[in-house]
Design a protein with these regions (language model features):
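Short acidic-glycine loop/turn motifs at beta-strand connectors
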Residues: 45-51
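Short catalytic-loop micro-motif centered on adjacent basic/acidic residues
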Residues: 3-5, 30-31
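Nucleotide and nucleotide-moiety/phosphate-recognizing core
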Residues: 14-16, 25, 47
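Catalytic-core segments of class I nucleotidyltransferases/pyrophosphorylases
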Residues: 1-2, 9, 18-22, 35-37, ...
Length: 126
C-alpha cells in the first residue's frame, strides 16, 4: 500500500518503486527519499545500505523523507504494537530493522506547508 502525505507535489514512477520494494524483500515499510531542498524542513535519513538506522530533523544527511512510503498493513499489525503516530511506528520498525529506504527518488518533489512554499512551487513545476 502506498501512503502519501497530502502536502506532496511530485512526479514519481510507481512501477520503479514497486520493483525496488520487491527487490528489497518486501519490508514492512519502505520510505521514498529525496535530496534535501533549501528552505524545506524534513526528516533526514541515516542508513546502512538501505536499512534505516535513524531519522533526525536536526542532524543533516544527503537525503530526507518525502512523506511517500510503501507499507504492508498486515505485517505492521502482526509485528508492531498499535500506534497512530508514524514517528513511533518508524522507531519501532528501526528497532527490528524493518524500516527501509528506497533507491528510487521522485523526478520532481516538493511539499506545500505554507503560502511561501506554494509561491515557490510554480518555479519548480514549470
Amino acid at each position: 500500500m502506498y501512503v502519501l502525505t497530502c502536502d506532496n507535489v511530485t512526479n514519481i514512477d510507481f512501477k520503479k518503486i514497486e520493483k525496488d520494494y520487491y527487490k528489497k524483500g518486501q519490508p514492512i515499510c519502505m520510505i521514498i527519499p529525496t535530496k534535501p531542498i533549501k528552505g524545506l524542513a524534513g526528516d533526514y535519513i541515516f542508513r546502512k545500505k538501505n536499512i534505516i538506522q535513524g531519522l533526525s530533523r536536526k542532524v543533516k544527511s544527503d537525503i530526507y523523507c518525502t512523506g511517500i512510503q510503501v507499507l504492508n498493513p498486515k505485517k505492521i499489525n502482526d509485528k508492531i504494537k498499535s500506534t497512530n503516530d508514524f514517528n513511533i511506528l518508524w522507531k519501532r520498525l528501526i528497532k527490528i530493522k524493518q524500516l527501509y529506504v528506497s533507491d528510487v527518488m521522485p523526478k520532481k518533489w516538493y511539499t506545500v506547508d505554507n503560502v511561501d512554499n506554494y509561491k515557490k512551487l510554480k518555479k519548480i513545476f514549470k
